[in-house]
């Protein structure tokens, strides 16, 4: 191939068209042929080194097929040599063939390694859309503190009423499998994922816009908060299904990296919302925060266009598939899914641990009463409560680290036993804050509240991680996503029931927005009630998490 390069430089077809004399042409041909033979002799005297191919400029071109390369080389040779050098060209064919069997590395391979990655996941438009949806779910906590102050200060509700509205707002999280059935079986405008993300974002923006400008009663507030919760729950199911689809067929490291990206995006959004939630409420008011929150779900609608999804078509005709909630196909599919789901849940090895999770979550709590006490009695400002919320968001990550570092190898029964007992004892420290004993110890109310929230949140998150691991273990092969969503819905149902029971106890003890005489008794009773499920620890599996697969450790760490 080197000889061809030299030959093409010394002879050009254009040289034969401008000379008037035939003798000169013959003389030039003879000189050129002689110089060509000499150059080939010099090349043959060199060692048989295949590295000579490095001087050829052809490897810079895209390498597609050997036939294309041969055609390209032959065309260059014919142009360079004309009709007078066929013999010499044939003599060089073997060298060309040997060089062509060692193609240079493809440039496309280097491009993939230079793409941006985060948590080990390539930041393709599709993955960016998934991460942004999880980020929005985390940052929507911006309105949580504003809702609490709105119900307390603007609508003048008692702690019990606030607890009821908070519990009702969690109802959409109890039917998450239904959203999965709808998304899988009923394409909207030809898409199963993209359209529902757009719709969820618009629904969330609509609900928070109503909260920002039109809501003026507890009933309308409860309705709008319920709509906002529905939008988040539906988008959560849709994006979870997208993650499952992308993780299917991938290696464990890729699946774990994708889960880490989702969890990291949600946690980052939660920390951002915690940092700004209190200061925005104090500086601009709750209506302004609701207006800002109304813009956030639109991010979900906007990034939905980045989702890589094929339009659903009918296999036979190729026309767009049009299925409604009342169509026979959807009803039949839903019926089959429900039968299959119930067949899995009623198995003793699934039903009994699920029953324990529900009862463990269904114990009453006094969160609403404590919020009223800290704001109306202790005078905690929205900005300070926002800082406390920031601390608890970081503490939640510390709780996950505590579980991953020290508790993964501990049997499940022992984890629930130890964390429940310690949580009950540490929960009693709220009585110190209510009684003011911390001030006698020289600790201010603010610092005691921060420290108490930090410790309790770390322990609560560490104790909740086994619930996620257990739920993942209970899911049989083939219906992991559906059954996991069902188990999380049952867990959320227990939490809602606990909140409603706490509201009833708050009302029974006569705790109002200005009267906190029995708050210490309520705190003690709620903490002691968390010990009630312990005799049922025998419902849990006996084995240790050492037997778990690595996939169980990659469960998405979301309490919702």
Swiss-Prot record:
This is Folate-biopterin transporter 1, chloroplastic. It is found in: Plastid, Chloroplast membrane; Plastid membrane. The lineage of its organism: Eukaryota, Viridiplantae, Streptophyta, Embryophyta, Tracheophyta. The keyword ATP-binding does not apply. One of its GO terms (biological process) is methotrexate transport. It comes from Arabidopsis thaliana (Mouse-ear cress). GO terms for cellular component: chloroplast envelope; chloroplast membrane. Pfam families: BT1 (PF03092). GO terms for molecular function: 5-formyltetrahydrofolate transmembrane transporter activity; folic acid transmembrane transporter activity; methotrexate transmembrane transporter activity. The chain crosses the membrane at residues 129-149, 162-182, 195-215, 219-239, 261-281, 288-308, 339-359, 390-410, 415-435, 450-470, 483-503, 521-541. SUPFAM superfamilies: MFS general substrate transporter. It is a multi-pass membrane protein. Belongs to the major facilitator superfamily. Folate-biopterin transporter (TC 2.A.71) family. Disulfide bonds: none annotated. Constitutively expressed at low level. It comes from the Eukaryota. Mediates folate monoglutamate transport involved in tetrahydrofolate biosynthesis. It also mediates transport of antifolates, such as methotrexate and aminopterin.
């Amino acid at each position: 191939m080197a000889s061809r390069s030299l030959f093409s430089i010394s002879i050009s077809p254009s040289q034969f068209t401008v000379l008037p004399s035939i003798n000169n042409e013959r003389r030039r041909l003879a000189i050129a042929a002689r110089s060509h033979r000499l150059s080939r002799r010099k090349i043959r005297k060199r060692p048989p080194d295949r590295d000579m191919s490095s001087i050829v400029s052809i490897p810079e071109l895209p390498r597609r097929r050997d036939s294309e390369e041969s055609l390209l080389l032959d065309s260059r040779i014919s142009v360079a040599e004309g009709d007078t050098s066929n013999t010499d060209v044939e003599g060089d064919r073997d060298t060309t063939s040997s060089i062509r069997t060692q193609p240079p590395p493809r440039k496309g391979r280097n491009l993939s390694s230079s793409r941006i990655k985060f948590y080990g996941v390539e930041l393709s438009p599709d993955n960016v859309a998934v991460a942004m949806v999880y980020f929005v779910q985390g940052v929507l906590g911006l309105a949580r503190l504003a809702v609490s102050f709105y119900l307390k200060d603007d609508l003048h509700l008692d702690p019990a009423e606030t607890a009821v509205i908070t519990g009702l707002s969690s109802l959409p999280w109890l039917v998450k499998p239904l959203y999965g059935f709808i998304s899988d079986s009923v394409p909207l405008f030809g898409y199963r994922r993209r359209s529902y993300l757009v719709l969820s974002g618009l629904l969330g923006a609509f609900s928070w816009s109503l909260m920002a400008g039109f809501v003026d009663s507890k009933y309308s507030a409860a309705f709008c908060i319920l709509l906002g919760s529905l939008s988040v729950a539906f988008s959560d199911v849709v994006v979870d299904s997208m993650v499952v689809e992308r993780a299917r067929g991938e290696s464990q490291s890729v699946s774990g990296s994708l889960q880490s990206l989702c969890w990291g995006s949600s946690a980052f959004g939660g920390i951002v919302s915690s940092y700004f939630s209190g200061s925005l409420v104090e500086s601009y008011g709750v209506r302004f925060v609701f207006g800002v929150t109304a813009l956030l779900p639109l991010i979900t609608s906007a990034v939905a266009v980045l989702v890589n999804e094929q339009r659903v078509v009918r296999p036979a005709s190729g026309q767009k598939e049009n299925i409604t909630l009342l169509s026979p196909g959807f009803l039949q599919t839903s019926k089959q899914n429900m039968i299959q789901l119930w067949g899995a849940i009623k198995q003793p090895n699934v039903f009994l641990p699920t029953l324990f999770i529900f009862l463990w979550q269904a114990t009453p709590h006094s969160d609403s009463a404590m919020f009223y006490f800290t704001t109306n009695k202790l005078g905690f400002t929205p900005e300070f409560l926002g800082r406390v919320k920031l601390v608890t968001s970081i503490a939640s990550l510390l709780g996950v680290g505590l579980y991953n570092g020290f508790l993964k190898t501990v049997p499940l029964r022992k984890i629930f036993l130890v964390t429940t007992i310690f949580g009950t004892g540490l929960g009693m420290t709220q009585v110190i804050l209510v009684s003011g004993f911390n001030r006698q110890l020289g600790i201010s109310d603010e610092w005691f509240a921060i420290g108490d929230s930090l410790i309790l949140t770390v322990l609560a998150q560490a104790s909740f991680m086994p619930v996620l691991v257990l739920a993942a273990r209970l899911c049989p092969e083939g219906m992991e996503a559906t059954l996991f969503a069902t188990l999380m819905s049952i867990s959320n149902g227990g939490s809602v029931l606990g909140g409603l029971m706490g509201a009833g106890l708050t009302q029974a003890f006569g705790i109002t927005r200005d009267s906190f005489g029995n708050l210490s008794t309520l705190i003690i009773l709620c903490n002691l009630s968390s010990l009630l499920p312990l005799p049922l620890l025998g419902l849990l599996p006996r084995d240790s998490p050492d037997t778990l697969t690595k996939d169980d450790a990659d469960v998405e760490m979301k309490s919702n």
